Amino acid sequence: ALILPHGARYNAFMIDKTPPALADIEAAARVLAPYAVRTPLISCPALDERVGARVFVKPEILQRTGSFKFRGAFNKLSSIPQAARAGGVVAFSSGNHAQGVAAAAQILGMQAAIVMPADAPVSKRERTKGYGAEVVLYDRAREDREAIARDIAGKRGATLVPPYDD
């Protein structure tokens, strides 16, 4: 993995892959419908003029947890087989994915452990805990968040939910 600023890592799993099929998108929409906020599409005439096309903005700040990450997290957790849900989930994130996974796990009645950097904003750590997740702090200068998450998942029989590749 390539080390990026702030200890983030670029890894091969982050490379764009084949886009999801329309049927997969429609299935995800059905799964999310009862739980996700239906955020509006807002037109932006000034932006339309600037780029020479109609542009719509989707304010996902209005979504549960304040981010689009809830959608992906909920869809992923919903796909975990019932028998595997007892082990809970483990994720690693500085904030938005952490909160998305924590909120989705709470709704689905699953345990969640979230590996977060010790220097993540206190507000993000507290919101993640507020959704019922266990927050496991690490030192991003000295520790590998993915290794920590894999270790926790292995010990608990939990499903690892990375913030990418799904």
Q: Where is each model-derived feature located?
A:
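N-terminal amphipathic/basic-hydrophobic helices that include classical n-h-c signal peptides
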Residues: A1-F13
